[in-house]
Amino acid sequence: MILLKELQIKNFRSHSDSKIEFDTGINLIAGRNGAGKSSILEAILVAFYGLKPATLRKNDLVRVNSSGYSLSLTFSLNGDDYTISRKSNGESILTGKEIVEGDSNITEWVERHLCPAHVFTGAIYVRQGEIDSIIRDDESRERIIRQITRIEDYENAWKNLGAVIRMLEREKERLKEFLSQEEQIKRQKEEKKAEIERISEEIKSIESLREKLSEEVRNLESRLKELEEHKSRLESLRKQESSVLQEVRGLEEKLRELEKQLKEVVERIEDLEKKAKEVKELKPKAERYSILEKLLSEINQALRDVEKREGDLTREAAGIQAQLKKAEEDNSKLEEITKRIEELERELERFEKSHRLLETLKPKMDRMQGIKAKLEEKNLTPDKVEKMYDLLSKAKEEEKEITEKLKKLIAKKSSLKTRGAQLKKAVEELKSAERTCPVCGRELDEEHRKNIMAEYTREMKRIAEELAKADEIEKKLKERLEKVEKALEKQETVLKYRQMVDELKALENELSSHDAEKLSAESEEYRKVKERLDGLRGQQKILLSSASRIKELKSSLREIEEALKNVESERGELHRKIREEGFESLEELEREVQSLRPFYNKWLELKDAESRLESELKRREKLEDEISEAIAKLEEANGKAEEIRGQIDELLRIYSEEEHRRLSDEHLRKSKELAGLKSRLETLRESLQSAEKDLKFLEEQLAKMDEYRKKVEVFEKIAIPELTRIREKFRKYRNLVAENSMREVERYASQIFEELTEGKYSGVRLKKTTERGKEKLKVFVVYQGEEREIGFLSGGEIIALGLAFRLALSMFMIRGKIPLLILDEPTPFLDEERRRKLVDITTNYLRKIPQVIIVSHDEELKDAADKVIFVESQGGVSRVRYVEAQ
């Protein structure tokens, strides 16, 4: 026995995060259309069996803007609790008494321990619109009954056996065709033996020829190896000879260059010896020039410094004298200005208090004037602003009132449109219906069709009129709302001006206790006196600074006069130094330096002759050593060249280039011939291997002939006749099972329907009839001992019969017990009276089932429910809450 306990749904269909708890008895899932009720039943189906029986794609189930769904279903099976958790990414697990992982493994476990998927969807879970489809639709009824009674399994077995028999017949014919080729295969075997013998003889002949040719090639290779060694040795000696001769030429060139350099060095030594002698003669005059030139340079620099300092001091003294005169004049003006400052300070003190007060009030006065200017700019007064604020408050109230009316009106229109759509759909179905009324389920005739269509047309007209009135009211409300919203657009501006008026009143009240005109006049007088006083103080500061420097300037002037005396003393000291060197004047010293300069320059030109002479002497010694070394190397290289020439002549007596070329050509020709023989041998061996393989295959085929003859005999005498007999038994047993299954379903349905209709109908019959050459399974009810077609039943009775059949199929599959029943919208197109009657009929019977789950938006079913689960849509998301059962 199975009982569902709890279902947790995340991001599945319209459910974001829902938790549903189920109890025993009747669980009603209620709510408006589109709220997400049926999604709960789909979640149960997917949790048990995965996506396949739901005939849905994963992407259709995942909630918008989420990455994937997850489901968790807790249930009790034979007293043990289990939980199945499935995710859209394939992560699935069953926990409880057993632990099972993986989508397919869990589905297999459910089908083994609970029931197969087709049983669940055919009997336990009746989807929306299918409760009476088994009664109204002949094809649907026969398909469901064939699935649940497993008649299709026997038909499939009968068809599959036919396919097996045909396959054996084809295999038998194939084997016979093969046996007919026995003589041809024997002939092919003898031909292959002859081919193998011929190829073997040719291989022996070619192998003998190849061995002889291989020996000749080996001898040629040995002689060619000797010649290659001689050739290689000869080429090596010639390279050595070329290298040595090149070395000889290089040494001869080097020797000539060294002798040339030695000659040039000897000539430079002779010239430098003459210059060294001249340097010794010029040295005393050069030294005298250096001493006097240094003295002259120092005295000239000192005289320039003295003259510069003398000029700077003279200019500085003139400047100080001018400043001293100005300071003495400023000192006489200072007393007069100080007296004037004292007078203005007393006058400033009289106006200071008024000025300070005005400075405090000035920002507020400016703000008040600014507010007045802004209001005048907009042609506003405080009274006008107050009136605007009152109008704004009224507009807010009116907006709230209109918005509330629009909400109620839109809700009413939505309800009218929904009812109109239902009526339109019902009218369309009435137009196309043939025998049964889709509204009440009764037999349909033209008068009944016209009456219902007229009633529905009148109601649709009334709904259209109400919708038109509602549209007109909505239009007027929206026009009023638009005007109010335009008025409210100025809300921020009105509030801003009202705040400015409040501020203006506060400022006027605060400033009314002060004489602003008097304060302004006294403040202006204060500003003027302050301006004159600041000017005099600036002058006083400048004069005071100037007068305070008189003493300092006189002291600086005395210091400059002393410095000028020192400068004159330094000039006399410089002239004394000139006389000490034996010159009467600076000009005489300059003439002496000028006369010695040519001797000094000549000495500078020749002074490094001695060091250069020493360097050239060392260079001469080095060149003489290098020449001796080059002569020795040249003699050695000439000897080596003679030795190599002798070895080359000796090698040419035993090596012939002509013989080498001739033997190489012969070796190439015979190598190609040998390669051709090897290639031919490989081809022959491959042909031999292929022929031997073909021979083996032919021998194997001949060996199979007896086995295939036995197989053909088994097929003809045993397998095919026996399978044909078994297939015929399946055909007979299929008909027997079909008859027994239908009688059992018929018995269960009769019991349930009789109880649902409180004995009005005493039975249900299933009969096969033929219409237009096609066999159909039709349903009849027994009323007062007579069989009647289902057109005799009312709409509620049709639903009851459909429910009886669904329950009968469930009992057939699970041995007479119904632990669980799930119904999705069992009352489509029934009016209030018929729905109430169906509730009355079915409630007592459904209470015999341990657990029933019904999805419906009909209020009448709440009376029959033990638990009411209410589903509503909020912002496109399904929300679940529980309502107390009535």
UniProtKB/Swiss-Prot annotation:
Positions annotated to bind Zn(2+): 437, 440
Q: Does this entry carry the keyword Nucleus?
A: no
What PROSITE patterns is this protein classified in? ZN_HOOK
Indicate yes or no for the key word Zinc: yes
Any idea which UniProt keywords this protein has?
ATP-binding, Coiled coil, DNA damage, DNA repair, Hydrolase, Metal-binding, Nucleotide-binding, Zinc
What cofactors does the UniProt entry give for this protein?
A: Zn(2+)
> Coiled-coil ranges per the record?
183-360, 400-433, 489-518, 545-713
- Pfam families in the cross-refs: AAA_23, Rad50_zn_hook
Output this protein's name.
DNA double-strand break repair Rad50 ATPase
Give the source lineage, highest ranks first. Answer: Archaea, Methanobacteriati, Methanobacteriota, Archaeoglobi, Archaeoglobales
